[in-house]
Amino acid sequence: MVKNKGKKLFSDSIQLEGHQGEINTGKFSHNGEYFCSAGNDKTINIWEVFDKKCQNVNSIIHAHSSPILEIAWSNDDDYIASCSVDKRVTLWDIYNGNYIIKYKEHDNFVYSIDFCDNLICSVGEDCSLIINDIRMKTKSNSYQHKYQLTTCKFSDNNNIFFGGIDNQIYKYDIKKGQIDKNFILIGHNDTITGLDISHNNKYLLSNSMDNSLIIWDIQKTGNNLSKKLMGNKHGPEKNLLRCKWNNDDTLVSCGSADKIVHIWDVKLGCIIKNIYGHNGSVNEVDFNSLVPNIISSVSNDNTSIIGYF
């Protein structure tokens, strides 16, 4: 086990307790210093990762009126955006816990959210992709799909990948205000629940209720499917299980209903590590940018775990 000499956890595995319900989302800040979690108790918790006790430094109680389904950090880590069953997307100041803007453009549950520069994208039950510029109080762009959308991810500040219950992944060009009809990724057999872009911006990772992860080469035209990974599980509760690349794009991980954090070696195409500790579905995982062999996980068991792997 190789640890960063400058930063280290106070224990090899830390269980964070502070939520009173299932945790749906949990992400490290871009600088790796903080961890944010949120879920069915409508609370957003922020933890200082390398503090002697991994201290909870801020709790935003009743951040939404219904369960929170996903959060996203701004590029500078000064803000967090959250989306909820209450149909709202909210932008928060992490230092004082106050909301800055509440966006109310969605007509139903908002399932997924992502942040890039000044833009926030969100998708939901109303079949819409909505893009908000945090410098404005009204939406800057939107796209109406035929089916419910469950996940979205910026690849840069001009393109957004999104997917939903039609099992396909689409690319939306922000400047053109339309999807690329020549770029539709087909390969999953059930709802897409999570997306993540590799750090080199060459590959897209997707998680699906068909119990597979797919790595797509998004620089190719034609057959984009690069590799299919198996081993994760989706349960009858149909949680939106998210997925993640590690810092150097050699490993991937994802949420899994079997209570296990699975880590795949991308080159080998197989699971190289299983991490146990949760008593419920693992809904989201994240790799720490500051110390590459630290991973986080959040679960239906009301806890988050941060530890070395």
Predicted regions and their residues:
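Short C-terminal beta-strands that terminate individual repeats in beta-propeller domains
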Residues: 12-18, 51-63, 83, 99-105, ...
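Canonical WD40 repeat/beta-propeller blade segments in eukaryotic WD-repeat proteins
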Residues: 21-27, 66-73, 108-115, 146-155, ...
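Conserved strand-to-loop turn within each blade of WD40 beta-propeller repeats
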Residues: 37-41, 82-86, 123-126, 163-166, ...
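Structured C-terminal portions of repeat-based eukaryotic scaffold domains
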Residues: 177-291
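Blade-level signature of beta-propeller repeat domains, shared across WD40, Kelch, NHL, RCC1
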Residues: 283-309
